[in-house]
């Protein structure tokens, strides 16, 4: 399924998600335009991961409104799952397969070609040596790049990344920032979670803060304006 035309990738209006009777999101409202790079900041337990899972169509909306890439989540969560890519802490890789085999497996599922796999690896700066290395033997940064290459071959329009900088050294974190900016220049929208104040403010044009399941601030570091 293709997405409906429009400039807004994510629109939440007083969105409530209840997990086990507990309001993991308690009336969150925000919007993300297509092509934006946005950091979602907050302490553990504030609803960051739940918001990503909501936008990925993995958890139901209890109340409020939520539209992702032109699709109303109340109507068709399955359609949304075909349009977005959610990357969690474990990267979703098979440790016994090589880097390239992991990406090729995703390509096979979505009907992408071997050339698409090669192009994705090249975009992520994955060289021939890394490509034939088992995922279990890769560094944290290399595993993250492999997982992101899978999002590219899926042609995911919206990248939802849960703590993508976690476990990376400074050099790998800075390289990841460049990759995410390049992804938006290529047409993707990127929303990632972090609990690091400095990383959100310095590396990303816009930072949305969650507390208690609600959006408490929305700041553009590029223009220095709080919304």
Where are these regions (language model features)?
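The feature captures the beta-strand-to-loop junction immediately N-terminal to the Walker
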Residues: 41-43
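Helix-to-loop junction immediately C-terminal to a conserved catalytic motif
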Residues: 56
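Conserved ABC transporter NBD signature motif
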Residues: 64-75, 80
């Amino acid at each position: 399924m293709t997405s409906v035309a429009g400039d807004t990738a994510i629109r939440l209006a007083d969105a409530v998600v209840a997990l086990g009777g507990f309001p993991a999101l308690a009336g969150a409202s925000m919007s993300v335009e297509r092509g934006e790079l946005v950091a979602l900041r907050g302490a553990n337990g504030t609803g960051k991961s739940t918001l990503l899972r909501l936008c990925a169509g993995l958890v139901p909306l209890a109340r409020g409104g939520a539209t992702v890439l032109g699709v109303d989540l109340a109507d068709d969560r399955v359609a949304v799952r075909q349009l977005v890519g959610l990357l969690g802490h474990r990267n979703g890789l098979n440790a016994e397969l090589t880097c390239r085999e992991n990406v090729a497996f995703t390509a096979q599922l979505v009907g992408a070609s071997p050339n698409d796999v090669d192009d994705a690896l090249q975009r992520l700066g994955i060289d021939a040596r890394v490509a034939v290395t088992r995922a279990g033997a890769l560094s944290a940064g290399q595993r993250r790049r492999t997982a992101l290459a899978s999002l590219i071959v899926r042609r995911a329009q919206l990248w939802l990344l849960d703590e993508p900088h976690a476990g990376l050294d400074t050099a790998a974190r800075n390289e990841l920032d460049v990759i995410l900016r390049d992804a938006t220049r290529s047409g993707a929208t990127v929303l990632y979670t972090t609990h690091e104040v400095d990383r959100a403010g310095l590396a990303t044009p816009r930072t949305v803060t969650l507390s208690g399941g609600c959006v408490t601030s929305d700041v553009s570091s590029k223009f220095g304006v709080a919304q």
